[in-house]
């Protein structure tokens, strides 16, 4: 009986202490201030937030969680921040941007992106499956399309790739720029529309879910889009031709500003790189089996006979015709972009001479 009373008394004392500590009597237990993220990285992509919904849960959120909350990533997507595609070049050059998703890591028809390559960025490398395919002897014409590919040229690669594609003209075989004259092409941006004009073609805004019908009915002759998108969308069945044209070849990769990375503590640098490395196969699987389609590489192999590469001399001519456009775009975004483009052109010239 006495033992029960003693236990009851002890229980009451403990309960009373808990009440006091939880503030039920108007007292509050001393608490440490909420830990705020000590470091912040600003991320941007030239696409609306809904375009790549996998990005935050499969990558950005994983990095933040792995850092134990010490790192915050401010996610600004196209349409939600004030920077148009080429203007992001200026933002990056001023060091106001730490991370970005870059579409087309090689020579780009939207030439201001090329300026990013001359800045201190750590860029992603190629997906193993794609490069194995391009190295296949039977795919020499496809491999030649990557005649100026980033892995060879910039020597700054080796991290990650979260998707991959080759850009070109779906529905059209282009042996000469004359083959594009009069063609009605689906174009995803006004930059590409302007580029098509210089070769006598016209660009049209056709929603992705209407492209099959538009191609089949002749409303459009082709589409400026990625090979992966073209095939996985079933568009080969509507217009079974594709010409890879390196006006926008390459990869969709995560880009991290080297300077931003260097400012972080060594352990956080390691956490970012390790998390990206761990998530790379997860995201790649997501692309191949979900975001794009199953049997991606099988599809490319199956349609091998319809895939051709634009000859480098034709590409060079195309680029030469587009140079005035690129100069205009550089002027639109101000002197910083123009200066970077000048440095890039000089780098490009020296690199080309070193390969002769």
Where are the model-predicted features located?
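N-terminal secretory/targeting leader peptides
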Residues: 9-12, 27-129, 145-356
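Active-site-proximal, glycine-rich beta->alpha crossover segments in alpha/beta enzymes
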Residues: 133-134
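Bacterial N-terminal signal peptides
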Residues: 12-24
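Bacterial N-terminal signal peptides that target proteins for export
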Residues: 2-14
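Short, low-complexity interaction segments enriched in Ser/Thr/Pro/Gly
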Residues: 1-2, 33
């Amino acid at each position: 009986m006495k033992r029960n009373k003693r236990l009851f008394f002890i229980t009451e004392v403990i309960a009373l202490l808990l009440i006091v500590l939880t503030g039920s009597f108007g007292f509050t237990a001393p608490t440490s201030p909420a830990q705020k993220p000590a470091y912040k990285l600003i991320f941007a992509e030239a696409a609306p937030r809904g375009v790549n919904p996998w990005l935050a849960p499969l990558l950005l959120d994983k990095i933040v969680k792995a850092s134990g909350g010490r790192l915050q990533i401010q996610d600004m997507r196209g349409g939600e921040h004030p920077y148009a595609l080429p203007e992001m070049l200026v933002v990056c050059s001023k060091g106001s941007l730490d991370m970005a998703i870059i579409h087309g890591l090689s020579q780009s028809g939207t030439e201001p992106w090329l300026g990013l390559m001359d800045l201190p960025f750590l860029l992603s490398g190629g997906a193993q499956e794609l490069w194995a395919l391009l190295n296949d002897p039977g795919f020499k014409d496809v491999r030649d399309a990557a005649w100026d590919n980033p892995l060879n040229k910039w020597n700054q690669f080796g991290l990650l790739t979260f998707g991959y594609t080759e850009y070109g003209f779906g529905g059209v075989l282009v042996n000469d720029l004359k083959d594009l004259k009069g063609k009605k092409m689906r174009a995803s941006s006004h930059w590409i529309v302007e580029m098509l004009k210089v070769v006598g073609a016209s660009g049209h805004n056709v929603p992705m879910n209407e492209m099959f019908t538009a191609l089949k009915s002749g409303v459009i002759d082709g589409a400026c889009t990625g090979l992966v998108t073209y095939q996985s969308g079933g568009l080969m069945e509507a217009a079974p031709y594709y010409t890879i044209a390196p006006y926008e070849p390459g990869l969709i990769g995560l880009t991290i500003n080297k300077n931003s990375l260097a400012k972080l503590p060594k352990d956080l640098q390691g956490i970012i790189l390790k998390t990206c490395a761990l998530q790379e196969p997860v995201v790649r699987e997501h692309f191949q089996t979900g975001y794009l389609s199953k049997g991606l590489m099988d599809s490319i192999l199956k349609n091998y006979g319809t895939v051709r590469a634009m000859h480098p001399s034709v590409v060079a001519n195309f680029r030469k015709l587009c140079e005035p456009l690129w100069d205009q775009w550089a002027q639109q975004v101000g002197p910083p972009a123009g200066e970077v483009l000048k440095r890039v052109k000089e780098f490009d010239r020296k690199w080309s001479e070193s390969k002769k």
